[in-house]
Design a protein with these regions (language model features):
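N-terminal hydrophobic/helix-forming segments and targeting peptides
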Residues: 1-345
Length: 345
């Protein structure tokens, strides 16, 4: 589990908003090669690796995504601040007050700043607390001496430059992991650690398994392509959603029965439930009402496979998120148990 936590820290330290994932793809390729694998980078920028199993006729496909929420420069404002366009789905208040980095395409520089509502000062603006947060009043205050559009553009900033959010990753003495982008870098870390263990311990899986690290999940078309024809089961490892009426918590693995795309495959879900009960893996079944995954994207793209979704419980999803090492451990055990099991009947 210590190595999984290390992978989480390393992954969250790399900026990877959807569409700006070259660095994290490079990290994955380098890490997998060091483990002794031969990863393949897809045309879209994802990274895949395959472990040949005892059954090489029917295959499994397991995914986690390493792209995250982010933003992009929409315009340079007359006062030198930046107007934003969001990448991924989240309300503006989820990023208000967050430190950020502008990745300047023309120079390769990284410029720091803070995301704020325009009328931030409560000493000046009566509506500082009541104004609706919208694209028109949310902006980046650059950490540079700029007071107008010309000065900002002189820094090389242009429309289309990506903006990443400070993850602020913290692991507490009580076992909590607090960070942005635990969705879905927790799952990616779990897959990396299992791949490490399988290689070091020379474990042979019962079924040939493709591990896919996707980079477009947050905008709806992650690992929905490059699925080998032999694949019959597709497992997305992604976050479990917490809130009112939810069973998911920060201490168990969450198995999704339905999200916004509809129900997941019943027999596959029950296969996971039986494994969890047999191996005393703490789990919760749940519905994620406003949610889609790589697996649901694959189904929408026409994949003819059994599909399932599970993951660690993530509190305050798409904001400053939190989970606990107990949930990470339960999720890792669940994925491991599945990968060592027979195919779903």
């Amino acid at each position: 589990m210590n190595q999984t936590i290390n992978y989480i820290k390393e992954l969250t330290a790399i900026a990877s908003p959807t569409g700006f994932t070259r660095e994290i793809s490079d990290y994955l390729v380098h890490t997998l090669e060091k483990l002794g694998y031969q990863p393949v980078r897809t045309a879209k920028g994802g990274v895949n690796v395959t472990i040949k199993g005892q059954n090489d006729e029917e295959h499994r496909y397991v995914t986690a995504h390493v792209d995250t929420l982010g933003a992009i420069v929409r315009a340079v404002k007359p006062d030198g601040r930046l107007k934003l366009d969001r990448i991924g789905g989240f309300p503006w208040n989820m990023i208000e007050g967050e430190n950020c980095t502008v990745h300047v395409a023309s120079t390769g520089q990284k410029l720091s700043g803070t995301i704020l509502i325009h009328q931030t000062s409560c000493h000046v603006y009566k509506d500082a607390g009541t104004a609706e947060r919208t694209q028109d009043n949310m902006e980046v205050r650059l950490d540079a001496k700029v007071t107008n559009e010309k000065e900002t553009r002189a820094l090389g900033i242009e429309v289309g430059d990506f903006i990443s959010f400070d993850p602020r990753t913290i692991v507490t003495e009580t076992g909590f992991i607090k960070s942005r982008h635990l969705d879905d870098k927790v799952s990616a870390a779990i897959l990396l650690n299992l791949l490490r263990i399988y290689k070091e311990e020379k474990i042979e899986l019962p079924v040939t398994t493709h591990f896919a690290f996707s980079v477009f999940e947050e905008v709806g078309h992650g690992a929905n392509s490059n699925i080998p024809a032999q694949v019959v089961e597709y497992l997305a490892v992604d976050m479990g959603a917490m809130g009112d009426d939810q069973q998911t918590d920060e201490y168990t693995v969450s198995i999704c029965v339905k999200d916004a795309s509809g129900p997941y495959h019943y027999d596959f879900r029950q296969h996971l439930v039986v494994l969890a009960k047999e191996q005393d893996i703490p789990f919760k079944l749940d519905i994620y009402p406003f949610y889609g995954s790589d697996a649901s994207a694959a189904m929408s793209a026409g994949a003819e496979v059994k599909h399932a979704l599970l993951g660690a419980g993530i509190e305050s999803s798409h904001s400053y998120e939190r989970t606990h090492i107990d949930s990470v451990a339960a999720t890792e055990r669940m994925v491991d148990a599945y990968l060592k099991s027979a195919l779903v009947d």
